[in-house]
Amino acid sequence: SSFNGDPLDNPIGTGPYLPGAFEVGVMAELVKNEGHAWWGEGAALDKITYMDFGTDQAAIFAAVDSGEVDMVYESIGDFILLMDDIGWSKSEAVTANTVCIRANQAAEVDGATPYADVRVRKALAMAIDNAVLLELGFNDNGSVAENHHVSPIHPEYAEMPPVEYDPDGAAALMAEAGMADFEHELISIDDTWRKNTSDAAAAQLRDAGIPVRRTILPGATFWNDWAKYPLSATDWAQRPLGVQVLALAYRSGEPWNESAFANEEFDALLSEALSIADADTRRETMAKLQQIMRDEGVVIQPYWRSIYRHYREGVLGAEMHPTFEIHVSKLGLAA
């Protein structure tokens, strides 16, 4: 009855570090666990301090440039080159991390459900050149994707032809759906690459004659309703298998199915794919799933991210991980 599972109030553990000071939105500390000898290798530091600078990359770089920090969680955009220029070491990871611009098919806007119409969803995708979003949104630090959220690094990925880019056809399809004059609202978080990607998408929609306005929200607001917005951009971390991504994000009724996509054929094929252990055998079914994703205009998924982390000379074990993990037992400082 006296057990308290909060690690801040009752820091008991078998690892090399325990939580120390903690202030939400400001900082957190890990301190060496003196209660036992760490049986693994490493864990050479007395204390590790995490500092929260928010989404402002300029503030993060200022901390780097002033020597306030020894490494960053992630280096983004122009700040990759800036940290290169000051001589910090750079580590890269090729990933299946991405951003998805998705329409919520069940969302109501002024009493209607504009994105329930597949023509509207496909028109949005046809108006956007994914290569432009990679260039303007993420400084070309990655590879162009194909609007189905299965990556070439997933073992069961099926090769697909390039995404169709046809702004004139997009405008015609939007008009056919009776939505030529409808103003879309594209919502994103206020950080650099997700904001920039959404800005570039909105610009291309306007160039195609599709009205759109942008709404940019701070993180504390955006994540409250991220799965409910009618049209928004969300970043997704990689999963080891493509079937994991599709099951988590696109199967009917799943909590994280932010597109509200519900398709019986897709669900049946996904169940079949999940039952096939061999990736090469599973690929045939995955090809059908990927094609449904594109035919139904479920997401605009423009690129796969290469991700970077910088650290100052003498920091050890700080290399970037495909899912952003920091293995604190490996962190250390050169003698």
Language-model features, listed with the residues they occupy:
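Gly/Pro-rich hinge or "lid" segments in bacterial periplasmic/extracellular proteins
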Residues: 1-41, 167-168, 172, 335
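Ligand-site clamp/hinge motif
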Residues: 5-8, 35-82, 202, 211
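Alpha-helical secondary-structure segments
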Residues: 15-16, 44-47, 66, 96-146, ...
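Structural transition elements
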Residues: 16-17, 111, 126, 143-176, ...
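Long beta-strand-rich cores associated with HINT superfamily self-processing modules
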Residues: 18, 309-335
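Ligand/substrate-recognition segments at binding pockets and active sites
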Residues: 24-26, 51, 142-143, 154, ...
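Periplasmic binding protein-like
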Residues: 64-65, 70-74, 86-89, 203-253, ...
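Extracytoplasmic/peripheral linker and loop segments enriched in polar/acidic and small residues
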Residues: 119-122, 213-222, 245-313, 335
